[in-house]
Amino acid sequence: MCRLTAKHLSSVMTALVLAGSGAFAQTPQERQWCESENEVTVDQRIDGCSAVIKAGREKGDKLAEVFNNRGVAYRLKGDHERAIADYGQAIRLNARFAAAYNNRGVAYDARGEYDRALADYEQALKLKPSAEGYFNRGNAHLAKRDYDHAIDDYNQAIRLKADFAAAFDNRCWARAVLGVLKPALADCSQALRLTPRNAATLDSRGFIFLKMAQFDAAVSDYDAALRFSPKRAFPLYGRGLARLKNGDTAGESDMAAAKALQSDIAEEYARYGMQETR
């Protein structure tokens, strides 16, 4: 799931663009660093792309690809401001560069600037519709608690990519928050078929079972979520609620442990319609 207050599931950056070797950088190694997706460090990628830019031999669309690649590296390093600047340069050089719009949206998303992210995702989807683009836009809607539009986008993502586990997971959460519990349960179960050990999906399904008053099933899913990720407040608090509703006073210690990890966890559950009771 993608809960703004607990865990924002990462959006999907468009892969690095390989610019080709029509012009030479300062060294072949620096170009390889700029274009490589997996074999180099983030700092090497930044250095390589910076060398290509400084050499001044790339122009137009080719130079846009270099700026996009360096922006991806800055984003991976957590330097969103520089990433946004590089994506902006890429877009100025190539106004139809869908990947740069998508990637700038991801950077805005990471900074909590969801309206700007939505505008960039919108443009990316106009230029080149993709499952990842719809998923990213859905995440921005979800962060704004615009659950209906988020669900619409996850529908499109799943239509284009039937095994998109993260889209099933996030659609599950959006539906759960809206109280559309049976479809939400189906989505979480499908996400778990695709990624069985996903703690976030397990605690989403546990939350659905909690709302359905199926407390044993809720405890089972929260137990599984905590086995894979033991220091998370959301499943701890949910398990505590489910235990208390089942008459098990061990729920008190779960809820206390959850509050120690996240002081406002009770308020978060209350926003989703699950108040603490004694």
Predicted regions and their residues:
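Canonical positions in the second alpha-helix
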Residues: 52, 56, 89-90, 123-124, ...
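Terminal, low-structured helical/coil segments at or just beyond the last alpha-helical repeat
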Residues: 28-33, 241-278
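TPR-repeat structural position
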Residues: 42, 80, 114, 147, ...
